[in-house]
Amino acid sequence: MPSPNEKLAESLDVLKAIQEGNQRVFRSDDLSRVHRERLVDNGFLQEVMKGWLISSSPDAQAGEGTPWHASFWEFCARYCDERFGDQWHLSPEQSLFLHGERTVIPDQLVVHSPKATNNDIKLLFGTTLYDLKVAEMPPPAALTVREGLRLFTAAAALVRVPESFFQLYPLEAQVVMASLADASDLLRLLLNGGHSAKAGYLAKAFRQTGRGELADEILRAMKGAGYDVRESSPFEAGQIFPKPSRPTAPIVSRVEMLWESMRGKVLAGFPKAPGLPADKEPYLRFVDEIYPTDAYHSLSIEGYSVTPALVERVRQGGWDPENDAGDRRNRDALAARGYWQAFQLVKKEVEKVIAGENPAALARAAHNDWYREMFQPCVTAGLLEPGSLAGYRNIPVYLRGSRYVPPRWEAVREAMPAFFDLLEKEPEPSVRAVLGHWLFGYVHPYSDGNGRMARFLMNAMLASGGYPWTVIRIVDRKSYLSALDRASIEMDIHPFTTFIVRRVQWRLERHDLKFPAPKESFDLGRDMVFFYGRDGETWVRCAISREALDDHFHGDGKDKLKVFRANRQHIEQEVRRKYLAGDTELDGSILIHSDDLPDAEQPEEASQPAEPDGGSPEGIRGSAEDRSRAGAEESRELSTAPGDETEESEKT
């Protein structure tokens, strides 16, 4: 009798057989009930509605919308074909969105058909499909089919949308207008329909956006046919974007207009650039110091299980795929090694940037090398084909947990040169950093690694203004991704700018931590040793867990204070490293867990703590209670306040 695994394998073979051309959408009767239920139960298929299924993944988390967003347009096309045959089309508004490379999954998709019943069909994750009954289909020449979707042509959609569309969606309207080679298709529709008012505002719109020759052609043709046409702008004040001088691919216009519309908002919220450092050595030394923290957080944001110990092992050359089978197979070790290799190349470019070379030109020339170094270990290990290092993606990609869908892979080849042109023309380092990071992720040129690449690019651009290397922390992942989503879906760059400013500001304020107070205590209830550092006039509460002392400093079964004192210098270095990166707890304190530490050996002799400088602290970074009682001897949560003369023994 076949085992459960053998039965599942049989069902997967059946599924593979019907997935021709990467098909993701299926009717229930495409598979037998047994295979269908087995694949649904094991997470390989997901039901959309009765009779319809989509491909899914057992790795998808409960409530995750990525499989649905990846299948949305294919589902809508196949569902409408099954129900309406060829008697359906999308609305003119949605047609313009798709022509203009607006790829966000809509909450509601409106489908027009003579066979419709004016019904709002509930789909997955809050999306709906509304079938709107219309009297008849438009002329065949007004429609085009793109990836299975029946759209109005760009010209037909511009004529059919109401004038209010131009105020509500000025970017989409102008992107599509910029893509038209001439006015012939528009004029045919305007003349045949007698649309003199539409001709007037379309002519004015073309004139306002730098296509005066098209505006003149529309006016001459309409007036020659006897129509009284008067120009009037369909846009509101401040809605006109850069003027293209020639027909431009939609994705290129979109990237250019997004940049222009957002750069002022970035400038308004960003601190003034410090300027290139006169002495580049301290700057580069800090980049080296921050690497372990940067690698840990950047890789963790992408879902890799990477510890500081692994990062340190890779940095010290302990990664050995030729002789260590575990390193060849370990996905996390491969990612850490790739990050280390890419980081070295980025650092070389940063050195050129702070020496005064053009940062955008350097990034344009080097970014594919960064990418190849990042994934070279996976190719060496046989987990990726060598061709995966060729460059930009040739497949669609989807973002986990987001309604935003990156541009079609065919558009990436046009988008990236335009992106780097904008980066080179931009005079402000802050704009290069913020919009460079966001738009790189918006285009998503690679099949993987785009987040890490965007953060590398951001830091290279920050260096061009003398801003410090900035770490995006794993603890901020939710707000970080949410801010990116706001920019990509709602075209609101303010949250992302504010987020980056907060991270940059920490280093601009030159926070640093010193350890002048030798007093420490062990809190049995919390299983931690507490001690203090000082940032200027502010005392910062620091702690290391019992687990960290046991795992990394041979503290199991020993007096924790003695173990701490014997390794104090090493522990203080790790605390300072976290503090420099702004990797603090919510209350401003620093806590060292076992996962924060690379492996360390117990030194033979205890390091000597610094002598206390005396005096009570004026402020303590820690809980609100700690700050209000700074220096109080009775605090049971903290160690004895810095400067106290009473020796604290280990509490057991």
In which residue ranges do the predicted regions lie?
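General helical secondary-structure elements
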Residues: 325, 448-451, 564, 617, ...
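FIC/Doc superfamily catalytic core
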Residues: 1-29, 40-50, 60-521
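Compositionally biased, intrinsically disordered low-complexity segments
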Residues: 154, 446, 496, 593-595, ...
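Extended, alpha-helix-rich binding/interface surfaces that flank or overlap catalytic cores
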Residues: 513-613, 619-620, 627, 634, ...
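Non-catalytic DNA-binding core/recognition domains of DNA-processing enzymes
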Residues: 35
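S4-like RNA-binding module at protein N-termini
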Residues: 53-56
